[in-house]
Amino acid sequence: MAGRSGDSDENLLKAIRLIKFLYQSNPPPSPEGTRQARRNRRRRWRARQRQIHSIGERIICTFLGRPEEPVPLQLPPLERLNLNCSEDCGTSGTQGVGSPQIPVEPPAVLESGTEE
């Protein structure tokens, strides 16, 4: 794998094999039996799938040393955000292309609540 060290590749392959084995050890439930029995089997299967998913995340963190939670993206305060188009009305890559946009009045169909 490009840009990775050999040791990291081995750890990644070990983690993938282990997670694949976990998922293969939990096949989907059989469609036989009463509706209630099928529902219970699906519910238990989904619970096991959730457990396998969380175990897989822990395996990835252990083998690859990644943080458990991603670093949150820092957004500016809402007070500083605006939708004012007066400073920069062009969109990137389209400035000067096509005809200039002319503001058009919206149709008067929705203005009155009575039919004519």
From Swiss-Prot:
Chain spans, region Homomultimerization: 18-26
Mod. after translation: Asymmetrically arginine dimethylated at one site by host PRMT6. Methylation impairs the RNA-binding activity and export of viral RNA from the nucleus to the cytoplasm.
InterPro entries linked: REV_protein (IPR000625)
KW 4Fe-4S (keyword) present: no
Residues with PTM Phosphoserine: 5, 8, 92, 99
Biological process, per Gene Ontology: mRNA transport; viral process
Biased composition (Basic residues): 36-48
Cited Gene3D superfamilies: 6.10.140.630
Top-rank taxon, per record: Viruses
Subcellular location: Host nucleus, Host nucleolus; Host cytoplasm
One Pfam family linked to the record: REV
Molecular function via GO: DNA-binding transcription factor activity; RNA binding
Motif (Nuclear export signal and binding to XPO1): 73-84
Keyword GTP-binding attached: no
Chain residue ranges for the region called Disordered: 23-48, 90-116
Quaternary assembly: Homomultimer; when bound to the RRE. Multimeric assembly is essential for activity and may involve XPO1. Binds to human KPNB1, XPO1, TNPO1, RANBP5 and IPO7. Interacts with the viral Integrase. Interacts with human KHDRBS1. Interacts with human NAP1; this interaction decreases Rev multimerization and stimulates its activity. Interacts with human DEAD-box helicases DDX3 and DDX24; these interactions may serve for viral RNA export to the cytoplasm and packaging, respectively.
Domain description: The RNA-binding motif binds to the RRE, a 240 bp stem-and-loop structure present in incompletely spliced viral pre-mRNAs. This region also contains the NLS which mediates nuclear localization via KPNB1 binding and, when the N-terminal sequence is present, nucleolar targeting. These overlapping functions prevent Rev bound to RRE from undesirable return to the nucleus. When Rev binds the RRE, the NLS becomes masked while the NES remains accessible. The leucine-rich NES mediates binding to human XPO1.
Miscellaneous: NDK, isolated from a Zairean patient infected with AIDS, and is a highly cytopathogenic strain. HIV-1 lineages are divided in three main groups, M (for Major), O (for Outlier), and N (for New, or Non-M, Non-O). The vast majority of strains found worldwide belong to the group M. Group O seems to be endemic to and largely confined to Cameroon and neighboring countries in West Central Africa, where these viruses represent a small minority of HIV-1 strains. The group N is represented by a limited number of isolates from Cameroonian persons. The group M is further subdivided in 9 clades or subtypes (A to D, F to H, J and K).
Database matches in HAMAP family: REV_HIV1
UniProt record similarity statement: Belongs to the HIV-1 REV protein family.
Protein name (database record): Protein Rev
Gene assigned in the entry: rev
